[in-house]
């Protein structure tokens, strides 16, 4: 528990360090104008930037039209401003935002999404749309259509939205998961009650804990492609109740391991999106690199069911799979003003490793619904369901592995700081399995007495992360 508390403090300490650095920078240097909404440097977005003057004479800037519309909406409408001006895409001159004409959904993404581009003259907007695509609209349509954020980011599933060329984010993540109930199919029981109910039961798992610290990186080399990397470090703990064959008493043994896990790499390609930037369809391809340790040491005794020596260390305690894995699937996202929906259908192939062990393949579907009351906050719920095939060791299917799990989580995003030409978010997720049907295997001991090989389930999981997002301004 002390280790968990110490690890949970890492994001908080990192956050305090970032705030201290930012305060120091403001004290030592002349402030550099940044977007009021997303934090991007204004001098890198001169071609698309907007200028907003409030009733009291104070002035703010945004990197482009999308963030301008969000700031107007957050302030309660145009009545909160003395003037709002945008840069004409053709001449570069500031023009009144209300009288400007806009092109939405073209092939050009100059700032944050959706990609509204302003023109002083309607005929020039129409000529641009004829060349680059998109829909020609006026200010009223743009204002009514804009959402507080260009997209939201789910936790356990993926988004179909790609944010635009040059978008970059890096984060630190702390995760914790605990399982504490014996599952035989869809029924759960306390581990102590399970082993005490059958004197022939030699052992039973009692509790598993997994802590994960990770560095995550996202980068978009093009407008339609987003790349992702996850570099994890695991701390795992597994408790087992074991019956002394001589005395019949039950004791508990604890196994621990920690180290680098398998590095995950993913790419999302957005092959279709609507002109209004409210519907998206993408394909996902991913792999893991076998950087985590897999202990292939085998039990010296032949397993009577498998008729071979099986891997001694449990699959749940292994840090890696000792082989590359492959994931593919489809993603779909849709927006309704302040609401975002994300869905995914993925399949992961786990090939056999060099120790003749293969984790079961996994089919997963997911659905997320997020609400964004303003551009700083997201609240949501996420549901994911997976079916995992049984693990195999030398071709023998491990009976107490695999099954069906459905998880429900509540999630949140809070953008708490604009700094360094971007913004920082504090992301959190807490959830639990709401349905499990886990595989078990009935067996008999040497005396012919029946017992059951089972898995752990139920429990809960949670994640906390700090993410910094920045976009390298495109050259238009």
Where are these regions (language model features)?
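Short cysteine-rich clusters marking metal-coordination/redox-active sites
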Residues: 35
């Amino acid at each position: 528990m002390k280790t968990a508390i110490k690890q949970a403090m890492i994001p908080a300490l990192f956050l305090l360090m970032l705030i201290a650095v930012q305060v120091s920078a403001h004290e030592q240097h002349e402030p550099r104008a940044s977007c009021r909404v997303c934090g991007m440097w204004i001098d890198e977005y001169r071609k698309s930037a907007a200028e907003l003057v409030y009733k009291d004479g104070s002035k703010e800037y945004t990197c482009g039209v999308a963030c301008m519309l969000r700031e107007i909406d957050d302030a309660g409408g145009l009545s909160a401003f003395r003037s709002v001006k945008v840069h004409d895409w053709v001449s570069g001159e500031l023009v009144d935002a209300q009288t400007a004409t806009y092109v939405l959904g073209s092939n050009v993404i100059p700032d944050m999404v959706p990609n509204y581009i302003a023109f002083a003259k309607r005929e020039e907007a129409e000529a641009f749309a004829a060349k680059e695509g998109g829909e020609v609209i006026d200010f009223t349509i743009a204002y009514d259509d804009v959402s507080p954020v260009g997209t939201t980011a789910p936790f356990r599933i993926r988004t179909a939205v790609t944010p635009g060329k040059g978008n970059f984010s890096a984060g630190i993540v702390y995760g914790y998961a605990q399982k504490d109930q014996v599952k035989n199919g869809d029924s759960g029981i306390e581990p102590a009650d399970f082993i005490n109910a059958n004197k022939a039961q030699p052992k039973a798992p009692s509790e598993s804990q997994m802590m994960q610290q990770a560095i995550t990186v996202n980068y978009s080399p093009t407008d339609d492609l987003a790349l992702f990397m996850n570099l994890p470090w695991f701390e795992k703990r597994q408790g087992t109740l074991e019956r002394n064959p001589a005395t019949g008493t039950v004791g508990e043994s604890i196994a621990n391991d920690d180290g680098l896990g398998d590095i995950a790499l993913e790419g999302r390609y957005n092959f279709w999106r609507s002109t209004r930037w409210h519907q998206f369809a993408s394909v996902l391809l991913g792999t893991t690199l076998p950087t985590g340790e897999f202990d292939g040491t085998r039990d010296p005794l032949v397993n009577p069911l498998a008729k071979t020596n099986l891997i001694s260390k449990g699959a749940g305690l292994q840090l890696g799979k000792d082989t590359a894995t492959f994931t593919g699937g489809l993603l779909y996202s849709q927006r309704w003003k302040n609401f975002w929906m994300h869905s995914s259908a993925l399949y992961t192939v786990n090939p056999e490793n060099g120790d003749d062990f293969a984790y079961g393949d996994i089919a997963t579907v997911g659905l997320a619904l997020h609400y964004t009351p303003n551009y700083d906050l997201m609240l949501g719920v996420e549901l994911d369901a997976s079916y995992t095939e049984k693990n195999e060791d030398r071709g023998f299917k491990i009976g107490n592995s695999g099954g069906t799990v459905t998880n429900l989580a509540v999630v949140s995003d809070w953008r708490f700081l604009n700094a360094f030409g971007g913004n920082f978010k504090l992301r959190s997720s807490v959830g639990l399995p709401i349905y499990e049907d886990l595989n078990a295997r009935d067996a008999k001991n040497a005396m012919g007495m029946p017992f059951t090989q089972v898995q752990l389930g139920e429990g809960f999981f949670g994640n906390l992360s700090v993410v910094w997002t920045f976009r390298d301004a495109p050259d238009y």
